A protein has these predicted regions:
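Nucleotide-sugar-dependent glycosyltransferase catalytic core
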Residues: 102-117, 248-251
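Structural detector for helix-capping/boundary residues
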Residues: 60-61, 77, 96
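Short, hydrophobic alpha-helical packing/hinge segments within bilobed ligand-binding/sensory domains
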Residues: 79-80, 109
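Catalytic donor-sugar/metal-binding loop of nucleotide-sugar-dependent glycosyltransferases
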Residues: 71, 80-99
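Core segments of transmembrane alpha-helices
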Residues: 149-165, 194-197
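Juxtamembrane C-terminal module of membrane proteins
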Residues: 129-146, 172-261
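Long helical/loop segments within the catalytic core of UDP-sugar-dependent glycosyltransferases
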Residues: 1-71, 114, 121, 125
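Catalytic core of nucleotide-sugar-dependent glycosyltransferases
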Residues: 32-36, 111-131, 198-199, 231-235
């Protein structure tokens, strides 16, 4: 893709250990969905995709011109924002597959995702004003899209709270916490819920991830999504801290095993 004129290219982040634990499977599902829904969609629309910390390449001319200069805990996200502010973007190559190792335990996952949210919040503080200024002053849709993406921690909190309220109404039906259920008929809500339940598995199956374990993984995936609520709150609270906690990688796997995934 560099020969086609692209300056920064992110590859497809796959998993080399999706079935080692419920955490590694949930991570894998999240990245499979992101590859198709976030990365491929933005590439098709001409927007900027996002760097993922591994499996990407950058033209040396870009580094020579704008430098690296990323200092927050999510330097991949920060450099993506820097590229967009300099009228560049990240492209996506779905055929360049990287088999990344996912965390095995919830503690490892907590530490890594908290670091992501610390860095994400730090990036939002640094780059939101600049991105919105560029978006409205220059009618730059890429900058606007990146600015909206930096609200991700807030979205995680809102999504988590919505799940809490929904489950609370199931347990305590006589005590309604919100009345959004009255906005549509029960039939419409049934369709919305059905689409939400089927959308993720269909996206993964569309990418030819045919395995009953993956389908079963979608039953625990909502719980993984819910854990983003406390992780995000902790990350926002400690956004000013710069401590890097390394995520251990110990999984040995042969190329033959990878080809069977």
């Amino acid at each position: 893709m560099l020969n086609m004129g692209h300056e920064v290219v992110q590859g497809y982040i796959d998993s080399k250990n999706p079935f080692d634990s419920w955490i590694s499977l949930s991570y894998s599902i999240a990245f499979w969905l992101s590859n198709r829904i976030f990365q491929q969609t933005r590439y098709n629309l001409g927007l900027s995709c996002g760097l993922c910390g591994t499996g990407f390449c950058i033209r040396t001319s870009v580094i020579k011109e704008i430098g690296w200069g990323a200092t927050c805990l999510t330097e991949d996200l920060e450099f993506t924002m820097k590229l967009v502010l300099n009228d560049r973007k990240v492209s996506f190559c779905k055929k360049a597959i990287v088999y990344d190792e996912k965390p095995l335990t919830f503690i490892q996952s907590w530490r890594q995702r908290k670091r992501w949210m610390q860095g994400h919040t730090d990036c939002a503080i640094r780059y939101l004003p600049k991105l919105f200024k560029k978006a409205f002053k220059e009618a730059d849709l890429k900058a606007f899209d990146c600015a909206i993406y930096l609200f991700q921690p807030i979205r995680f909190i809102c999504f988590g709270m919505a799940m809490v309220f929904s489950w609370s109404e199931v347990v305590f039906p006589a005590v309604p916490f919100y009345i959004i259920g009255y906005a549509f008929s029960s039939e419409v809500w049934s369709i919305i819920v059905l689409v939400q339940l089927l959308f993720g598995p269909l996206v993964v199956l569309f990418d030819k991830k045919w395995d009953i374990k993956i389908i079963l993984g979608f039953f625990i995936y909502p719980f993984y999504c819910f854990t983003w609520l406390p992780v995000t709150i902790a990350g926002i609270k400690d956004a000013g801290r710069k401590e890097w906690i390394h995520t251990m990688h110990t999984r040995d796997i042969s190329i033959d095993e990878v080809e069977r995934l």
